[in-house]
Amino acid sequence: MIKIITGRQTDPLQEKILATAIENYQQHPENETFIIVPNHIKFTTEVRAINKLASSKKQTETAVKNLHVLSFSRLAWFFLKDAEQGLPTQLDDAASAMLLTHIIEQKQDELIIFEQSNSGMVRQLYNTILQVYDGNLDLDNIDETNLDQETKSKIHDLRIIYDAFIEEIAGKFSTKNEVQVQLNDILAKNSELKNASFYFCDFSHFSLQEMLTIQILMRKAKNVTLAFKTRLGNINPKAEAGDYDYVIQQTIRRLVSFLQERDMDYVASEFPIPSEPTPREILNSLWTETVSKVDELKQVQLVKADSRYAEAYFVARTIYQQVALNNYRYRDFLILAPDLKEYETYLTPILRQNNIPFFNDLQQEMKYHPLVVLIENLFNLRDLKENPFQTQSMLAILKTHLLIPSWYKEEAEYIHDVDELENFVLAHGINHNLWKKHFADFVSAEVIRLDKIDEEVAKIDRLRGYLVDKVTNLFTKLEQEKDSQKALTIFFDFLTKNGIAERLEQWRDAANNAGDLQQAQQPEQLWDLLIQLLKDYLAINPEKFDLDEFFNMLISAFKEATFSQIPSTLDAVNLSEMGMVQTSGYKQVFIIGATSGNLPSIEKKPGFLTTENLNQLQSSFESDAYLEDNQRLNNLDQNYQFGLSLALAQDRVYISYPVLNASNEKLDPSIYYQRLQDYGAPEFSQHDLPEKMQELLSFITNPDASLGYLAYINSNTSDEAIDELLKITQKYLPQKVKAVLDASDFDNQPEDIGEDLAAELYGKNLYSSVSQLETFYENSYEYFLTYGLKLRRRLENEFDVIQAGNYFHETFDRLVKRLNEQHIDLADLSSVELEQQLNQVRDVIKDESKYAQLMNDPFNQYLFHCLDHTTSKVAQNWRKSLAETPLRAKYSELSFGLDQKIKGISLDIPDLPGNHQVNLRGKIDRVDLANFAEKDQVLAQVIDYKSSAKKFDLGMFYNGIALQMISYLDVLTNNNRFFAEEDKLSLLGAFYQTVTRQLERLNSNKLIDSSLNLRENAIDSKPKLMYTGLISNNPEILLEAEPLLDGKSSQASQLYTGVGTKARGGFKLPADRNFSEEEFQLLLEYDEYLIKEASRQILSGQIKLNPYRYGRSKNALTYSDFKDIFFFDAMLRHNQYHEISNMSKKDLLVKIKEKLGKKD
């Protein structure tokens, strides 16, 4: 008897099938009764069937013999277990990936499109090979006449790889779907099926081999019953692509056609339509458009959440409250998501916080396990000659905690040493062969605290030596070994003799003791797979061992492998993904992540053969030999699958989406969400935090999870109900409640430390630098952390912007000092002679340890080469410009301050009890002098090197953030005798020298004037190299600095940006950047005022979180290392930026006079 039962998506077809099958079993217990369901729901269906059988006997439990609940794969093993000829070892996904990688590398020269293998490509190829095998397709019979070049090339490569694959596994392995082929062979020969009954349900589609199984059973078995859920609960032979139930109707059509072509009798019946539809059935009718509208849609609740966190919390809160208040069980709830990985960091922690048991049936990949990480990074270290000991891989191995030396008795001690070793390695730039050197060889540089602690360095050096020896010994042996058996023994011994296997056992036991059965299984599953892979490799490649091939196969295999999972309790919320078959019987279903990008879940990435490729191959397919377009089937089935998800909920279904993703990007709801909204489904807004008292119920669960929300609303609202809830919570969590309530009153503004503690940190007198005080004015809290507590980010010896800047400075410093020592005027050198001088300077610099370590990296060598080009360009421009001016570089990197030849800025600090001073130290990049003996005068200018263009900002100076240039001028003024002896020291100004070789764009107006003529002086980007900054507006001083301007009208300066002569006489000067001698004196006085004021606040212990902000894009937090300490949020009332804006010279001088108490 063959029956095809159809029903709607809400009809209890599984219940019908189970009842029919159990009735048949009870009537004929001596005969076999089989219930066949998708593998995903086999366990729950089996439990349900046995419970149903027990209930029919009015028992709580029962034993069965001939009643079987199986999936197709289990059905195959059922019949194969007694077969005379058993199957060879099954080749799982991981081993298949290994074999295919091997074949692709072997057949490289014959293949057209496969240049190299990768895990994604291997996965696609393997699925296609399984399809070809499953689909009885002979690739040699494909007609290539009308195929395009892409399809021809793919078939060409597929044929080569497929034949090689089949040849390799013949007699040794079976594919995971070969068992289905063997099943059909056995069933076709089985004469005992005439008394067996088969019942199929919860399928919407069958593979070709599964379809063949059903067809054999239809011809040989006593009973075959199949149940299908369609749109109207009937068979529609005219269904077309795009119809709601097209995929399942196609499945039914193939079965019916098979029966009709062979004149086989069958009965088609429809599940009866109830007279009074339930809300669930009404929803299904609405979704399948069998009714156009309803008065009220009670079955659905739409949820618009502020974020994924809010969405996940809504789910947990709803489940918690339903279980607590409405007698639900946890197993009554199902959570579905189009992509469950998006909610990994939200959903499971929130469920755990609310003590909600759950089972996540999303398969967990093995590739993230520490053992796989260890193997991958060992492989990265295989090249001991050309690319040895890559720091990233060495550290990654240590951090797996699998390769721990035996002298460590406590893991905490090992972790401490790994952290210290990482700090040391990064600080000293240790990479490649430098790992072979003892760490003691690096400590002379004294770049970190650890360099001065010999005992600690010795400990981490021992760990370094251990790892280097283990890696070296392993790969030295493997490189020399050509026999696969011996090579695998070497690798296996490495894992076992170094305690890695023992470590995995410890992890397993610890997880078992903690009751985490899922985690406890992982080490064992991983180790079992590794053993199997080693066996498989030996079977695939028994003779000639290839190191790279072995590791590539191993890594590819692990990337394809997943951990098997079991639920730790039967009463648990189930987490799954849309599209996976689910058992019926859930009371409430949550569909989360219903965004426009996720639902419908359109598959955009094709398989190895695309839809276009398969369309071209259609003419070569037959009814019993074809390839299906799984991507197309998936996309056509989306509406139907969503309807199935809606129908799973007996009581209610919740569909939710987040308004924002983790990157704060706006998300739109799915078209399915919008469609339900159009049908009249109510929408609820779930916020991240309760905005008012009435919303609090949306956040209340257990005391632990609810406390934060109670504290939040308590800080914003005064209500007796909140006080009562907090009192109740305090009974369960007294310490945590106190801590959270105290935290809700937390103000992240730092407290002043007072004069006594400030004196301990800084001393009685403040010894500081200009740049440090600039940090104070940028954000005084950062000054405290940096120079008070001396916090530092971890030092990494890498060639960054700071290192590049240091190299620029050092190059120019040594050049100036070298020329002065040799009494050479830079202006007298030729271009070639200057380059020779620079090369000699560079050779000396690069031999120093701090740069020599960087030169081990070829890329760093290239960067140094680029920097040398830049310094040459700047130096050559400087040499040429000296023809315009008598100013010559007299001092470079000139230090000032206590114990220096040059006095620093020493000032008494006012308004502070006791006698306190501030002493500023620092270095001036360059001081240029010109001696005018006939005038008893020395002209001076300060030069400061910058790696990018910079202008002196008056607003920044006024607020203490740009003190450097004025302070340097103050140092010159205070050291008149040093620079000019008895003569007068005249200040030309302080200027920035941009160190760059950047050229102007060809279409820049700086290169081409309004008449479309080329600006000659801009061809080599000379304007970018001219001095910018503060300049004297004294005509006499200007002419002394650049004599060639004398007597010329409308002549632009060749040295200073914005300076030139006017047509009618006089000078054109940069607006707001030119000052008279009296104005310079005012700037110097204000500079000292700012220095004293900052020093007073520092020594009095005042600290503020007051970062500056200049406009919208520039602020003190942009490059700060302490943002995680500040927790600065401009939206909080306690946190405010110190706003700064540019100002004119006029406004600056007025404000300075006000501050200093001077009258105009």
UniProtKB/Swiss-Prot annotation:
Enzyme class: hydrolase
Keyword annotations: ATP-binding, DNA damage, DNA repair, DNA-binding, Exonuclease, Helicase, Hydrolase, Nuclease, Nucleotide-binding
GO molecular function, one term: helicase activity
Record's keyword annotation contains Endoplasmic reticulum: no
GO biological process per UniProt: double-strand break repair via homologous recombination
Gene3D superfamilies the record matches: P-loop containing nucleotide triphosphate hydrolases
Entry EC no(s): 3.1.-.-
Needed co-factor(s): Mg(2+)
Other remarks in the entry: Despite having helicase-like domains, this subunit does not have helicase activity.
HAMAP family in the record: AddB_type2
UniProt function note: The heterodimer acts as both an ATP-dependent DNA helicase and an ATP-dependent, dual-direction single-stranded exonuclease. Recognizes the chi site generating a DNA molecule suitable for the initiation of homologous recombination. This subunit has 5' -> 3' nuclease activity but not helicase activity.
Quaternary state and interactors: Heterodimer of AddA and RexB.
Name by which UniProt lists this protein: ATP-dependent helicase/deoxyribonuclease subunit B
Organism: Lactobacillus helveticus (strain DPC 4571)
Lineage: Bacteria, Bacillati, Bacillota, Bacilli, Lactobacillales
